């Protein structure tokens, strides 16, 4: 089982996404456990303040170090043995490779930043890892935590009903996912590719691989550059590039 401990000043934000669909089923099966911790519960003033003005001046408020430290000590989050992740725009960009690495742990702690930022001592003294879900600004780390929990949970054995589902998701193979179709085979003149109706699984597998290479090359060529392509992949990709060149030259 993989346990997530999420520290947030707004834990109620997680009620809906964690109480339905795949994540709810995974929790019901005992495959993952999600514990929410309200950072305000670890404050000592009557207003339960988790933020304060920055030393030296400047706009905005910063998350205070004391309540975060107390929360981590209360839940026994030992940064020497488990990932204690600060969700921040300054962190390592989250991707499938990071998700796969995190899924191998039995416990992950997520600290959701908020306000203008966090006291630097949270970053340096309490967290042992920083992760960002992209180069854009969000109100807080809660949305980032939802993304991370969902992505990592899918990789926990037993969470997905079909063992092949995770393996064929976009990015799991380093490529974007190939096109997929379901019934009916024709609708308003829009037909499913004949190869998928042929029943020839070898041909279908080759078509899917070629389409995945094509989609990745057209939309995310940077992913192709990172891959170690097999001879068959190179052959299929050459066919894709040749066809695309002919179309563009017409």
Swiss-Prot record:
Keyword Lyase: no
GO terms assigned for molecular function: tRNA (guanine(37)-N1)-methyltransferase activity
CDD domains associated with the record: TrmD-like
Catalytic activity: guanosine(37) in tRNA + S-adenosyl-L-methionine = N(1)-methylguanosine(37) in tRNA + S-adenosyl-L-homocysteine + H(+)
E.C. designation(s): 2.1.1.228
GO biological process, one term: tRNA N1-guanine methylation
Principal subcellular localization: cytoplasm
Subcellular location: Cytoplasm
Binding site for S-adenosyl-L-methionine: 113, 133-138
Keyword Metal-binding tagged: no
Pfam families: tRNA_m1G_MT (PF01746)
Gene Ontology CC annotations of this record: cytosol
Keywords: Cytoplasm, Methyltransferase, S-adenosyl-L-methionine, Transferase, tRNA processing
Top-level division of the source organism's lineage: Bacteria
Gene3D superfamilies tied to this protein: 3.40.1280.10, tRNA(m1g37)methyltransferase, domain 2 (1.10.1270.20)
SUPFAM superfamilies referenced in this protein's UniProt entry, alphabetically: alpha/beta knot (SSF75217)
Known function: Specifically methylates guanosine-37 in various tRNAs.
Self-association and partners: Homodimer.
UniProt xrefs under HAMAP family: TrmD (MF_00605)
Similarity comment text for this entry: Belongs to the RNA methyltransferase TrmD family.
Full protein name: tRNA (guanine-N(1)-)-methyltransferase
Organism phylogeny: Bacteria, Pseudomonadati, Thermodesulfobacteriota, Syntrophia, Syntrophales
Gene assigned in the entry: trmD
